[in-house]
Amino acid sequence: VSGMTTSPKVGAVVITMGNRPDELRALLDSVAAQDGDPVEVVVVGNGSPVPDVPEGVRTIELPENLGIPGGRNVGIEAFGPGGTDVDILLFLDDDGLLARTDTVELCRRAFTADDKLGIISFRIADPETGLTQRRHVPRLRASDPMRSSRVTTFLGGANAARTKVFAEVGGLPDEFFYAHEETDLAWRALDAGWMIDYRSDMVLHHPTTAPSRHAVYHRMVARNRVWLARRNLPAPLVPVYLGVWMLLTLARRPSRPALKAWFGGFREGWGTPCGPRRPMRWRTVWRLTRLGRPPVI
């Protein structure tokens, strides 16, 4: 995008299970209402048919559910290799809604103004209350969601990414299926010198939900946490990172079935292939630390 004389081209990827047709339509209408050049949208049916969508919206129906990263990667490639037919890709949850009409224009400006900006994480707010849940602020100091800052990860269903990032470091890790795939991409992007910003003025309305806490969730969270460390961390930090997360998990006093699923996932993370190992440089570890989140937590 840097040095572009014309306005950066923007696309959007939405994955759906086909079970929220009204919310999906409202989201697509909010994208169509954005100021500036129109945004090209691809809706990926992740193992399900895509409900009716407005004219001009492209749809891809996958025969099986590839998981969240797998579905998003299909959406990226629909915009050419690494998504590079466009300059910027938005990733939006199918039950979200862009609250304002200037969000895409703000994205264009942000990426044009800063060559090293790779990813922007939007603020998720409840449409009724306007409140943002702490877990939706992608940093350890989450008490003030109205404060924008540089961060070390981002929200998968409320972000914008420069497609040069995918071209350089690859897409999301398909095999994760669900949980921590954003942090895997974020760490690879940061290691390549890109920056990630959390912007409180770019808002995705999304109803407040409790995160699903079933056995499969606990298993994937633990397995992917191990994979994340094995794939991306310098060897001395792997046991530190996983030890800290084990203590934090135990401190939350999970139920016995949850703990059983978590430890099952932890074992699975060690006993199964995690994909290519590319440990980040120590200077990236230091950068993450300066940004407020050393990769031990």
Locate the predicted segments by residue.
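N-proximal low-complexity "stem/linker" segments adjacent to membrane-targeting elements
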Residues: 1-30
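A recurrent flexible, glycine/aromatic-enriched loop bordering the glycosyltransferase active site
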Residues: 126, 143-161, 183, 213
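A short, conserved alpha-helix in the catalytic core of glycosyltransferases
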Residues: 153-161, 165-170, 175-203
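Non-catalytic, C-terminal membrane-associated alpha-helical segments of glycosyltransferases
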Residues: 220, 236-297
